[in-house]
Amino acid sequence: MSTTNAINGNLYEQLHQGRTNMYKSKVDVVLGAQWGDEGKGKVVDMLASEVDIVCRCQGGNNAGHTVVANGTEFDFHLLPSGVVNEKCISVIGNGVVIHLPSLFDEVLKNEAKGLQHLEHRLIISDRAHLVFDFHQHVDGMQEAEKGGKSLGTTKKGIGPAYSSKATRNGIRVGELLGDFNAFSDKFKLIVATHLRLFPSINVDVEAELTRYRDYAEKVRPYVKDTICFLHTALRNGKTILVEGANAAMLDIDFGTYPYVTSSNCSIGGVLTGLGLPPQTIGEVIGVVKAYTTRVGDGPFPSEQLNEIGDLLQTRGFEVGVTTKRKRRCGWLDIPLLRYTSLVNGYTCICLTKLDILDTLPEIKVAVSYKKANGDKLDHFPGTIAELGNIEVEYAVLPGWQTSTEHIRNFKELPENAQNYVRFLEKELSVPVRWVGVGKGRESIINVH
């Protein structure tokens, strides 16, 4: 070995020696592994009973999570699903975009269902950006302009709000709570900017400022520096769980662009959306529905536009929590899951809605993609044009044709249902830790 290489080798060893770990705990993460609606909220609800803090890191009220607790069904859009656990602190991080009217409406609706004492256990980042009503109007107009090539946006203003953030004329929660005259000037400027681009939008600036003066006082008790809060919690050994919104295939960078959301809903968004370094991440739980669904437009290789798709839609009650649109349905897609596992680094899987497959005599699983010329693809296509022209190859597995809804022990599942789970494990080389066979948290089976 040359002297230079020897020195470099020593330097490399030195770099990795003597590391000090300033944290006493880790951050576990729950991420959607497909196109959303996998059942992340239920998984978070299950795990939140054992953690100190639950966080949202990205997205806005375009996300929809349903949690059933003590027989009551809660719908969350901005609030982390962990708020149903009264011993848990819920954090809305800096990467989230917040429409305050929707947040307050969501709080009121869920308080009416029995959610209590949120003022003592909800923290909102002062660095989170605000979504204004005009962002929502612009969202609808931009979607209408696309005509037959619409992206299927929720029209909640999420994209325009992130656009304002990226062009550096967005407004953050902390600015609303500071000098209100400075906030007013900035609000007038952002409205003027949007009016130049979209002259037909109607904004009553003075009425909005009056409204936001009230919102400032309503939201003030919840707001603090969440970055310091979370790092202090980790140094003190507090357990933290992050609830990813949307899902990997809707990620702005890694999803089926442009049929995606406007934020990073993969593991990277957890770090930037909460101000966490990579070494704080512990378990990364990929939530996988036992079949595949998608809301809105965009390519969907394993989609079933037939009686199978109809059966999955009907049995699975596949209607969007936020949009109320019927979800498109298809078979489980292994190449897609391998891809999102590469990006996110799943340490384990929670497989949900296995019971929806109970009536099928046989079940197909997409196992590989082929190009139009017959060549197998060894990677997930990077463009929608390429993804739209692939041919899907399926494995056919025997069904079990008996109800799994009331089973609570993995070994009591029908053999073919167990084989379906093991097939997924083998194909992904990631262990399946939980299997869901119903709506409530009690319907989640511990596999190992």
Curated annotation (Swiss-Prot):
InterPro entries in the record: Adenylosuccin_syn_GTP-bd, Adenylosuccin_syn_Lys_AS, Adenylosuccinate_synth_dom1, Adenylosuccinate_synth_dom2, Adenylosuccinate_synth_dom3, Adenylosuccinate_synthetase, P-loop_NTPase
UniProt family annotation: Belongs to the adenylosuccinate synthetase family.
UniProt keyword Phosphoprotein, yes or no: no
Record-listed IMP binding positions: D37, E38, G39, K40, N62, A63, G64, H65, T154, R168, N246, T261, R325
Binding site for Mg(2+): D37, G64
Compartment(s): Cytoplasm
Sites where the protein binds substrate: V321, T322, T323, K324, R325, K326, R327
Protein's recorded name: Adenylosuccinate synthetase
EC number, UniProt record: 6.3.4.4
Catalytic activity reported: IMP + L-aspartate + GTP = N(6)-(1,2-dicarboxyethyl)-AMP + GDP + phosphate + 2 H(+)
Pfam families: Adenylsucc_synt
GO BP annotations, alphabetical order: 'de novo' AMP biosynthetic process; IMP metabolic process
Keywords, alphabetical: Cytoplasm, GTP-binding, Ligase, Magnesium, Metal-binding, Nucleotide-binding, Purine biosynthesis
Known cofactor(s): Mg(2+)
Summary of the function given for this chain in its UniProt record: Plays an important role in the de novo pathway and in the salvage pathway of purine nucleotide biosynthesis. Catalyzes the first committed step in the biosynthesis of AMP from IMP.
Stored PROSITE patterns: ADENYLOSUCCIN_SYN_1, ADENYLOSUCCIN_SYN_2
NCBIfam families: PRK01117.1, purA
Pathway annotation from the record: Purine metabolism; AMP biosynthesis via de novo pathway; AMP from IMP: step 1/2
Free-text remark on how the cofactor is bound: Binds 1 Mg(2+) ion per subunit.
UniProt key word Electron transport: no
Active site per UniProt: D37, H65
A Gene Ontology cellular-component term: cytoplasm
Binding site for GTP: 36-42, 64-66, 327, 353-355, 436-438
Summary of subunit composition and partner proteins: Homodimer.
GO terms for MF: adenylosuccinate synthase activity; GTP binding; magnesium ion binding
Stored Gene3D superfamilies: Adenylosuccinate Synthetase, subunit A, domain 1, Adenylosuccinate Synthetase, subunit A, domain 2, Adenylosuccinate Synthetase, subunit A, domain 3
